């Protein structure tokens, strides 16, 4: 992605919209990149033909923080070896500019995410490592302190962001 240009992204391209007409419309609307794109070669071909890039999901082991019930277990469920195997199997495509690493993790998983992002940087050269964290309003239930801590893995959103910055080497924060 160019730093001197505002990049406009769209989240997800549904299978029914993976037609020449839909993708052409997407490009004509000024969309530069589709985030959470599936690794569908025909759809990626259409994106490339229309000058639209993709941050692709499903290349590496996925992770979703959800309600926090799985907080702190990412390293057990997605050991770094799985990322190495995924890199060995990866088939590049001109439309792919990034690898989707996951969505809304607990800060308890940030240390492992830091290592996973390092693997992405090393094993997928030239690809953007994309990680979306919880937005500030994304606490479940009644926002009681124990619910915040369970979901974010931190006592406040400020602490959640601080932990991200300390643990995960990305040039951005996406929420």
Name what the model sees in each region:
Residues 1-175:
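Glycan-processing catalytic domains of CAZymes
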